C-alpha cells in the first residue's frame, strides 16, 4: 500500500523517524485488514485551527478534534470493511491534529509517536468502514487498534 504523509503544521517538529513510524503502522494496519495491491492512503498532519475548520465544515462541530477520516467510498452496514477490487484504489484521507495529539499523549502518559500511531490506525479503520457508534463496534475497533499497535511494538 502506498502512504502519502504530509506535515502541514509547524507547531511541533516531525522528523523522519516519526514519519517512518507512521508509515510502518499504516502498512501494518493494511496487512492486518487484508488491504493489498495498489491501495493508497493519504495522511496529513495539521494544527488545531486547520482541523477545527474541517470539523466545522464536514461535521458541523465548531471545535478541534484529534483525527478526521474522509473515505472515498462509504460502506453500508452489511458491506465488508474492505474488498480488494484489484488495481488502484485510493482509500481516502486521514487528517490528524498534532497539537491535540501532543495534549492527549500527555494525558494518557505515553509518547507522541504512540498517540499519532494510534490516531493513524483509528483513522485508517474508519476509511475501511469501521465505526464506534455502538458498544460492539467500539469494542471491535479498540481490539483491532491495539492488536495492530502491539504488532509494531507500540503498546500502552
Curated annotation (Swiss-Prot):
Pfam families: YbeY (PF02130). GO terms for biological process: rRNA processing. It is found in: Cytoplasm. Binds 1 zinc ion. InterPro entries: MetalPrtase_cat_dom_sf_prd, YbeY, YbeY_CS. Keywords: Cytoplasm, Endonuclease, Hydrolase, Metal-binding, Nuclease, Ribosome biogenesis, rRNA processing, Zinc. GO terms for cellular component: cytoplasm. GO terms for molecular function: metalloendopeptidase activity; RNA endonuclease activity; zinc ion binding. It is an enzyme of class 3 (hydrolase). Its main location: cytoplasm. Gene3D superfamilies: Metalloproteases ('zincins'), catalytic domain. Zn(2+) binds at residues 122, 126, 132. Signal peptide: none annotated. Its EC number is 3.1.-.-. Its cofactor is Zn(2+). Belongs to the endoribonuclease YbeY family. Single strand-specific metallo-endoribonuclease involved in late-stage 70S ribosome quality control and in maturation of the 3' terminus of the 16S rRNA. This is Endoribonuclease YbeY. The lineage of its organism: Bacteria, Bacillati, Bacillota, Clostridia, Moorellales.
